[in-house]
Curated annotation (Swiss-Prot):
UniProt GO MF annotations: deubiquitinase activator activity; DNA binding; double-stranded DNA binding; single-stranded DNA binding; ubiquitin binding
Source species, domain of life: Eukaryota
Biological process according to GO: DNA damage response; double-strand break repair via homologous recombination; positive regulation of double-strand break repair via homologous recombination
Protein name, entry field: WD repeat-containing protein 48
Keyword Transmembrane helix annotated: no
Main location: nucleus
Gene from which the chain derives: wdr48
Organism of derivation: Danio rerio (Zebrafish)
Function: Regulator of deubiquitinating complexes, which acts as a strong activator of usp1, usp12 and usp46. Enhances the usp1-mediated deubiquitination of fancd2; usp1 being almost inactive by itself. Activates deubiquitination by increasing the catalytic turnover without increasing the affinity of deubiquitinating enzymes for the substrate. Also activates deubiquitinating activity of complexes containing usp12. Together with rad51ap1, promotes DNA repair by stimulating rad51-mediated homologous recombination. Binds single-stranded DNA (ssDNA) and double-stranded DNA (dsDNA).
Residue segments, region Disordered: 611-632
Entry GO CC: late endosome; lysosome; nucleus
PANTHER family, alphabetized: WD REPEAT-CONTAINING PROTEIN 48 (PTHR19862:SF14)
CDD domains, A to Z: Ubl_WDR48 (cd17041), WD40 (cd00200)
Keyword annotations: Cytoplasm, DNA damage, DNA repair, DNA-binding, Endosome, Lysosome, Nucleus, Repeat, Ubl conjugation pathway, WD repeat
Family: Belongs to the WD repeat WDR48 family.
Record lineage: Eukaryota, Metazoa, Chordata, Craniata, Vertebrata
Length: 677
């Protein structure tokens, strides 16, 4: 399903095109999991990934494969999710600046809210009122009526929202009580700000933390609040007294995640130190170390299907999600066998999780090879892979080889200008094309491994070819060579479709490839799958979103001009020849040194008078190819070219000479001399 941010084209910032190289079905979390929501009625767990994907899992332990489905629409980290309407609706918040409304049972996106101007980091939910709040780095808090959101349609797509102002810094945490009478935000301002969401009135500001407030919880009636901070403390606040009434120093490092039981008497905490504790709020010395994760804890979700809770789900910066049993803790608590010495190290009650939702690997390192087409990557499992940027696919799994050695092994003395950028934020390869350099790279078809139908070796623009492949299914990009009258006839004969030219004629990208149009600042305007661009709705939205620089290439077929490189050609000092007038020459940066040698041979050295005399008319005579080959062979036998006294390989092109040998600013200077016989 496509998403679009409608906006006046004149007011739009520069638009980039991105795409993700990935499998059609990404079954496993590729990166850390930022948020969890449990639906005990359906035995389903929702995970919100840093790979931009929300996944649904069965928590039925008898099921061998827990994966149910993926919910894909976001283009950046999903930072928070909330289940509403008794599990029928899911709300998500993302670093792509959007809040999305999903049908949780069927797994599709119903609507997208684009009110935020920066990363959306936190959501809060008032269950009794079906009210949701969203907040993020733009310092804004917006209130949403869930029943209104779920009623949105293509024609009825206007929604009003209330906003809470007053935050001075980026918001990282949010909490609202079930009855929707109090809402609290935590931020890098290190204070808690409190509002009444019914009137949007500011109620108070609570000071005490010395670092970012990462997690917040409110009791049912909105009289008490728990906060976890990067300063390593958990604080209990009385809103009636407008002050902190208890501070819990349980963790060695920042506290990033909190859960509390229904009675608001026991708090579960986790964070940077990877440990998960349960602390009795009435007696802080009664703390239990439940378990220790293998990575910093990002989120926890209590299984509230029983009271007291029998298990807790935990996600971390790694891709695995673990379910830890709390039964041993309840038995331990009943025994009263606490270690009241808070300075003494505690032994975890659980050493193995009760259930594990396995995760996948995340790409953590990459190297763009010199051909500016292939990329080497290393993932969290230390496995190395070889990727084809142009065809948007993995070329080869190389296994656990030495990454640096593999880079050295694949080095070629060839220079191609940069024409794309790579991002690994989601754990997958995201390639971005920008108008400023997308068309910088030209290559010969044969060098790129492509053959032309007519046997020629045309010059190909990599960025142009890729854009044509990404939008191959968009009808507006198709070429129909027939005249209108013939079109009508062919349509009747059923031949029209076969005559339409699609794509670039050389290669295709996988049809499931996500294509993203976004502002340079990161805001997504439109996301769709490559294969869906032929749909009526998607095609219409593409008309409104695709920038002119992409239209020029894909629709109008106006390929950019070749890159020119200026250079000087002079006799080498060892040749004894008189230095020529310093004329500034210019040629395509892909011109091979061999062609410059031919120029020197024919025009300057003048070894073959006949060749020189006929060179101007050679193109019009039979045997042109044979004569060109003769000249090339003679030139290589008689002439050598040098740059900074290094003899040049005839197969090199000018841009490679400039990049690897000349290496400095100013115009390239090439010297020539006759080979000694």
């Amino acid at each position: 399903m496509a998403t679009l941010h409608r906006q006046n084209a004149a007011g739009r910032r520069k638009v980039q095109v991105s795409y993700v190289i990935r499998d059609e079905v990404e079954k496993y979390n590729r990166n850390g999991v930022n948020a969890l929501q449990l639906d005990p009625a359906l035995n389903r767990l929702f995970t919100a990934g840093r790979d931009s994907i929300i996944r649904i899992w069965s928590v039925n332990q008898h099921k061998q494969d827990p994966y149910i489905a993926s919910m894909e629409h976001h283009t950046d980290w999903v930072n928070d999710i909330i289940l509403c309407c008794n599990g029928k609706t899911l709300i998500s918040a993302s670093s792509d600046t959007t809040v999305k409304v999903w049908n949780a049972h069927k797994g599709f996106c119903m609507s997208t809210l684009r009110t935020h101007k920066d990363y959306v980091k936190a959501l809060a939910y008032a269950k009794d009122k079906e009210l949701v709040a969203s907040a993020g780095l733009d310092r804004q808090i917006f209130l949403w009526d869930v029943n209104t959101l779920t009623a949105l349609t293509a024609s009825n797509n206007t929604v009003t929202t209330s906003s809470l102002s007053g935050n001075k810094d980026s918001i990282y945490s949010l909490a609202m009580n079930q009855t929707g009478t109090v809402i609290i935000s935590g931020s890098t301002e290190k204070v808690l700000r409190v509002w009444d969401p019914r009137t949007c009135a500011k109620l108070m500001k609570l000071k005490g933390h010395t670092d970012n407030v990462k997690s917040l919880l409110l009791n049912r009636d909105g009289t008490q609040c728990l906060s976890g901070s990067s300063d390593g403390t958990i604080r209990l606040w009385s809103l009636g007294q407008q002050r902190c009434i208890a501070t819990y120093r349980v963790h060695d490092e920042g506290v990033w995640a909190l859960q509390v039981n229904e009675a608001f008497t026991h708090i579960y905490s986790g964070g940077r130190d990877r440990k998960i504790y349960c602390t009795d709020l009435r007696n802080p010395d009664m703390r239990v170390l439940i378990c220790e994760e293998k990575a910093p804890v990002l989120r926890m979700e209590l299984d509230r299907s029983a009271d007291p809770p029998q298990s807790i789900w935990v996600s971390t910066t790694k891709s695995f999600v673990n379910k830890w049993s709390l039964k041993a803790m309840h038995n331990f608590r009943a025994s009263g066998d606490y270690d009241n010495d808070c300075s003494a190290p505690l032994t975890p009650l659980c050493t193995q999780p009760e259930q594990v939702i396995k995760g996948g690997t995340s790409i953590v390192q990459c190297h763009i090879l010199n051909d500016k087409r292939h990329i080497l990557t290393k993932d969290t499992n230390n496995s190395v892979a070889f990727w084809d940027v142009l065809k948007a696919c993995k070329g080869e799994d190389l296994g656990k080889v030495d990454f640096d050695e593999e880079v050295k092994k694949r080095f070629k003395m060839v220079y191609v200008p940069n024409w794309f950028s790579v991002d690994l934020k989601t754990g997958m390869l995201t390639i971005t094309l920008d108008e400023s350099d997308c068309f910088a790279a030209w290559v010969a078809a044969k060098d790129a491994g492509f053959t032309s139908p007519d046997g020629s070796d045309p010059k190909l623009n990599l960025g142009g070819l890729l854009l044509q492949a990404l939008l191959e299914f968009w009808p507006r990009t198709h070429i129909n060579p027939m005249e209108e009258e013939e079109n009508e006839l062919n349509h009747v004969n059923g031949e029209q479709e076969s005559r339409i030219q699609k794509g670039n004629g050389y290669f295709q990208v996988p049809p499931h490839t996500p294509v993203i149009f976004g502002e340079a600042g990161g805001r997504t305007l439109f996301r769709l799958l490559c294969r869906d661009s032929g749909g009526e709705t998607e095609s219409m939205l593409l008309n409104e979103t695709v920038p002119q620089w992409v239209i020029d290439i894909t629709v109008d077929k106006n390929m950019p001009k070749f890159n020119k490189i200026p250079f000087y050609l002079q006799p080498h000092s060892s040749s004894g020849a008189k230095t020529l007038k310093k004329d500034r020459l210019s040629a395509s940066d892909m011109l091979q040194v061999r062609k410059v040698m031919e120029h020197v041979y024919e025009k300057i050295i003048n070894l073959d008078t006949e060749s020189q005399a006929t060179s101007s008319s050679a193109n019009d005579k039979p045997g042109e190819q044979e004569k060109e080959e003769d000249v090339s062979v003679m030139a290589e036998e008689k002439i050598e070219l040098m740059c900074l006294d290094q003899v040049l390989d005839p197969n090199m092109d000018l841009r490679t000479v400039k990049h690897f040998i000349w290496k400095s600013g100013g115009d390239l200077t090439i010297h020539y001399r006759q080979k000694s016989t």
